[in-house]
C-alpha cells in the first residue's frame, strides 16, 4: 500500500477502535463485577486511539474522512480482548509499514510514539487475557 492508502486504512481502524473501546468501557463497567479497572483502561485506550487520529491527520495534511463501520462490542471480556489483540497487532504492522514508507523524520518520530502506545495496548491486553485464563483454571 502507498502512504495515502495506509493513512486512510489506519484512520478508519483507529476511528473504529476509539469508538469500540469507549462503548466497551461503558459496557464492562456495568456488566462485570469490579469492572472499573477494565473500564478505566478501555477509556484510556479510546482517548489514545483518538489522539492517533490527530497524528495521522497531521501527517496527511488534514484528517481523512473516516469510513465508519459498526463493530459490535464484545459479548464477553475474553471475546473483546481477543479481538483487540488482533486489531492492535495489525495496527502495529500497518504503522511500521507507514513509517517505512515516509521520508520526513518528524513524521517518523510521531509514528514511533503511536507505535509505542499501540505496543503498550497490546501488552496490557495480553496481560488481561493471561489473568482471565488463569482465573478460569482456578475456578
Residue positions per predicted region:
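Non-heme di-metal
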Residues: 1-139
Amino acid at each position: 500500500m502507498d502512504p495515502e492508502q495506509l493513512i486512510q486504512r489506519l484512520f478508519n481502524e483507529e476511528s473504529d477502535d476509539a469508538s469500540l473501546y469507549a462503548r466497551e468501557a461503558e459496557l464492562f463497567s456495568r456488566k462485570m463485577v469490579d469492572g472499573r479497572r477494565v473500564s478505566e483502561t478501555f477509556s484510556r485506550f479510546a482517548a489514545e486511539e483518538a489522539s492517533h487520529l490527530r497524528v495521522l491527520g497531521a501527517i496527511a495534511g488534514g484528517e481523512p474522512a473516516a469510513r465508519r463501520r459498526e463493530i459490535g462490542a464484545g459479548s464477553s471480556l475474553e471475546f473483546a480482548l481477543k479481538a483487540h489483540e488482533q486489531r492492535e497487532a495489525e495496527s502495529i504492522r500497518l504503522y511500521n509499514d507507514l513509517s517505512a514508507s515516509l521520508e520526513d523524520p518528524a513524521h517518523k518520530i510521531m509514528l514511533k510514539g503511536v507505535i509505542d502506545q499501540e505496543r503498550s495496548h497490546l501488552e496490557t491486553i495480553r496481560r488481561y487475557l493471561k489473568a482471565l485464563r488463569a482465573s478460569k483454571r482456578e475456578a
